[in-house]
């Protein structure tokens, strides 16, 4: 939605968005996008509550429950990811958009963070710190909570994230002409 920079700066409240979208959703019950947005706003608040509950534990490699995690500090792999030189066009397109704008949609953020932490096995905190330095909508709670979730060390891990199924991701990717244009 690109509300995130406004939310991060306090110019717009999540409550206001929630109430407006809820009203729209009630008037247009078939709108799936409204339901998704409502869910994302609730998830945002969940991450805030969990971040304040667990506080500094979110910054540990093993996250809030101090899980054992296989990861490496591979700065060459990190640079490959940052410079959009991975083997995957979808990841590269998202990273190029991020480098050029300081913003990335939520699905892209989920995929690139999971790719770095699960496919490349790079310490998720390094990716989170990179995002912290680049995001135009940076929010400490949301950034670290989202990264921890995708690395499998957050609070909401009923299902352990695994490496991304890149063929399935690529199939979705090639349906979006915007990403193909970014790669040209």
Descriptions of predicted regions:
Residues 1-184:
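C-terminal catalytic domain of photolyase/cryptochrome flavoproteins
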């Amino acid at each position: 939605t690109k509300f995130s920079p406004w939310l991060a700066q306090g110019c717009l409240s999540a409550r206001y968005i929630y109430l407006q979208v809820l009203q729209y959703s009630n008037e247009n019950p078939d709108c799936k996008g409204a339901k998704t947005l409502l869910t994302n706003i609730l998830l945002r608040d969940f991450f805030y509550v969990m971040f304040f509950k667990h506080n500094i534990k979110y910054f540990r490699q093993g996250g809030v429950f101090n899980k054992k995690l296989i990861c490496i500090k591979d700065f060459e792999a990190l640079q490959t990811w940052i410079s959009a030189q991975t083997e995957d066009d979808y990841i590269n397109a998202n990273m190029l958009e991020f480098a050029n704008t300081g913003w990335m949609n939520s699905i892209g953020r989920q995929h690139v963070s999971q790719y770095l932490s699960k496919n490349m096995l790079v310490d998720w905190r390094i990716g989170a710190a990179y995002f912290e330095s680049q995001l135009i909508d940076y929010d400490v709670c949301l950034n670290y909570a989202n990264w921890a979730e995708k690395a499998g060390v957050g609070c909401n891990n009923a299902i352990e994230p695994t490496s991304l199924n890149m063929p399935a991701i690529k199939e979705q990717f090639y349906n979006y002409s915007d990403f193909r244009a970014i790669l040209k």
